[in-house]
């Protein structure tokens, strides 16, 4: 199945809930992962270093978790990475209306007060405060060609 593709603008309600776009929710309808119930109910949300939020479906997070669990607790850098990743992570439930509740800690991290831009980035959804995203795109506009040339 195709990954998350596209961009949508949504608002956070007064209780800190975010509506997940219907086209992204459809991707969850048949998710089954070892250790996760057949009926999808949650996503994994992470505070990203660039001050955005990233939402992962259980199948993708399971792969990341497997990679993290392979790291050594006795290697200081690997242990630090595990600590930083898990400190930045929460599981959020999807309610019947297709919303997830975002904690104040996560909203503050991303500078989100009301509106958000949700970007489908194949294996994850990236959630941005619209002003922060606009600033990033403005600052990075001249780097796009060189980045694309380097990686494609």
Curated annotation (Swiss-Prot):
Keywords annotated in UniProt: Cytoplasm, DNA-binding, Repeat, Transcription, Transcription regulation
Name of the featured protein: Transcriptional regulator MraZ
InterPro entries assigned to the protein according to its UniProt record, in alphabetical order: MraZ, MraZ_C, MraZ_dom, MraZ_N, MraZ_sf, SpoVT-AbrB_dom, SpoVT-AbrB_sf
Domain SpoVT-AbrB per the UniProt entry, residue ranges: 7-51, 89-132
Subunit structure: Forms oligomers.
Keyword Zinc-finger: no
PROSITE patterns to which the protein is assigned, alphabetical: SPOVT_ABRB (PS51740)
Species of the source: Pelodictyon phaeoclathratiforme (strain DSM 5477 / BU-1)
Subcellular location: Cytoplasm, Nucleoid
GO BP terms: negative regulation of DNA-templated transcription initiation
Molecular function terms, GO-annotated: DNA-binding transcription factor activity; transcription cis-regulatory region binding
The encoding gene: mraZ
GO cellular component: cytoplasm; nucleoid
Family indicated by similarity: Belongs to the MraZ family.
